[in-house]
Amino acid sequence: LKRLILILFYFLATSLSTLGQKIHELKLLDIKQMTEYEGRFDLSGITYKGDDIYVIADKKENNHIYKLNWRENDWTVSPKVSFDLGVDIDIEGITLNNEDAYLINEANNEVYKVDLKDGNASQLQIDWGKLKLPKKKWAKNAGFEGVAIDEEKQVLYLAKERDPRFIIEIDLKTQTIIEEYDVRKTCSKDFADLYFYEGYLYGIERNALCIAKIDPSTHKVVQHFSYQEVASREGEKLYEPVKYGMAEALMIKDGVIWIGWDNNGVEVSSFAKEKYNLKGTLPVIMLLELPDAE
């Protein structure tokens, strides 16, 4: 009974936290599944430069930045560049700044810069001394999960996933923390990825199948978007059985939201097979229309 009360309290708190925020249901433009890959590919990040789209995966063998080949009926990947960080890797996010990729490694919760041309890699020497919660006290598997960049201001945004969740702003010129904060009135208590687009920060709240549009100057949510109708059916997700939501990669390009799924090797659900003709255990990418700002 106590457990039931706690669950009900959580959902009530989540609902109350979003009161006053209109949630826009996103329109599906396309959905495609990865093909021609031997083994497991746990998609964890997506970004682009010009017409080229790049993705990453979070297993120890995925020491590559991959080029995504978007095709009529599916998508494939091919290694663009390989890197050696000199440590164990669990790459959970990517963002681009000119010819440099910034990667977050949840294995040690550090940020790395990788040259897209030759794979030369270096760790950013960020002073973490200002953190309210020292990294050594972070829960395992609850560290950096999202990264985004404001190229004009040269500000890097890092998302700590959960327990507790917060965003860290980094001045890339000085490699120091500008500020650290959480965002109120969100759909859930996690961030799975970030993307900076036209002055706003977008964050995936994967356990609520929701995206928050955040004003980085006020730290407030200005719009909520939901992909629940296109990514679930009566509680059944694209991949089952799973405990958590699995959307872990976020990109916005030319007014289109790209969401990638890290399915952890889980097979697609009956819902995904029937509605989208998906199959097997490889990840999908979903394209959704970004509504006009209100």
Task: Outline where the language-model segments fall.
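Bacterial Sec-dependent N-terminal signal peptides
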Residues: L1-E25
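Sequence/structural signature of beta-propeller domains
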Residues: Q21-E294
